[in-house]
Amino acid sequence: ERDGRFPLGEKRLMDVKLGELGSWLGKRDFTPNGVLASIRNGHDRYYNKYINVKKGGIGGVAMLLVGYVALSYMWEYDHLSEYRLWEYDDLRVPTTYSIIHLKAL
Amino acid sequence: MTLSFFDQFMSPTYLGIPLIAVALTLPWILFPTPSARWLNNRLITLQGWFINRFTQQLLLPLNLGGHKWAALLTSLMLFLITLNMLGLLPYTFTPTTQLSLNMGLAVPLWLATVIIGMRNQPTAALGHLLPEGTPVPLIPVLIIIETISLFIRPALGVRLTANLTAGHQLIATAAFVLLPMMPTVAILTSIVLFLLTLLEIAVAMIQAYVFVLLLSLYLQENV
């Protein structure tokens, strides 16, 4: 039944052709209820696949935490890119600790 | 220069959402609701075991009136310990380093114990201000001291903030200042960092526990 005559907004993402992506996004439900429903959906799918299993290991939670670390890195990227490690091999170090060399904003 | 040392405690904003909002909602995802099954999955079983043991230990010294606080105290403990431990992952933000959050948790809960005590048993609550068996000349001084100590109890929140901030700051200083300065003895600095991380894990758990324990103590006197 995977012919191209489905109503566009109800197809799953994998069935949408690239050219139709913009209009597919336009038909998705972006009301607060819809956003919450999709978050809950995604959470349930992840949970039931990786955590709610008979012999779940540490992988289910570990993937979540690694994703969180990556997300935090992305959030802080602007701020982190200002830090530079000590670049000079110069032993005649000034006594004031001008260690963290901030880029000019 | 002082700002650059404390920069790690500012919550950066991305697309208008501050990182603290993400960091605060993450514990919600990590504690799933138990289903109605006889045997749940391993994560829920482990968490359930921990919650049961903790609540049992916590409620031992409290009388029946205090048992109403069980859900609040246990959920507070879970929240704090999760926030503290998650803050040890790289690049993450620890919301409990913000004084506003900790005081927002400490002051209302402490005030609740005081008001409950004053309302239900005012004589006994005021009686806590004077320990038994004090010599008579000391009484005025001791009442003043005990009152001050009663009002300083919201320092519960300050304690949590200070401990976590200090730990993170130590790690940041060792990483940014010591490590680049002395590359020849870098291995010593790495050992220092490793030990500091272990310390931080311990501190994270202990601080959450102490917060809740003291609160239950205040409750015990007043309920």
Swiss-Prot record, chain B:
CDD domains: ATP-synt_Fo_a_6 (cd00310)
GO BP, one annotated term: proton motive force-driven ATP synthesis
Catalytic reaction equation(s): H(+)(in) = H(+)(out)
Protein location: Mitochondrion inner membrane
Covalent S-S links between cysteines: none
Listed InterPro entries: ATP_synth_F0_asu, ATP_synth_F0_asu_AS, ATP_synth_F0_asu_bact/mt, F0_ATP_A_sf
Chain segments annotated as transmembrane: 12-32, 69-89, 98-118, 132-152, 165-185, 197-219
SUBUNIT field: Component of the ATP synthase complex composed at least of ATP5F1A/subunit alpha, ATP5F1B/subunit beta, ATP5MC1/subunit c (homooctomer), MT-ATP6/subunit a, MT-ATP8/subunit 8, ATP5ME/subunit e, ATP5MF/subunit f, ATP5MG/subunit g, ATP5MK/subunit k, ATP5MJ/subunit j, ATP5F1C/subunit gamma, ATP5F1D/subunit delta, ATP5F1E/subunit epsilon, ATP5PF/subunit F6, ATP5PB/subunit b, ATP5PD/subunit d, ATP5PO/subunit OSCP.
Described purpose of this protein according to its UniProt entry: Subunit a, of the mitochondrial membrane ATP synthase complex (F(1)F(0) ATP synthase or Complex V) that produces ATP from ADP in the presence of a proton gradient across the membrane which is generated by electron transport complexes of the respiratory chain. ATP synthase complex consist of a soluble F(1) head domain - the catalytic core - and a membrane F(1) domain - the membrane proton channel. These two domains are linked by a central stalk rotating inside the F(1) region and a stationary peripheral stalk.
Family: Belongs to the ATPase A chain family.
Alphabetized NCBIfam families for the sequence: ATP_synt_6_or_A
The name this protein goes by in its record: ATP synthase F(0) complex subunit a
Organism: Oncorhynchus mykiss (Rainbow trout)
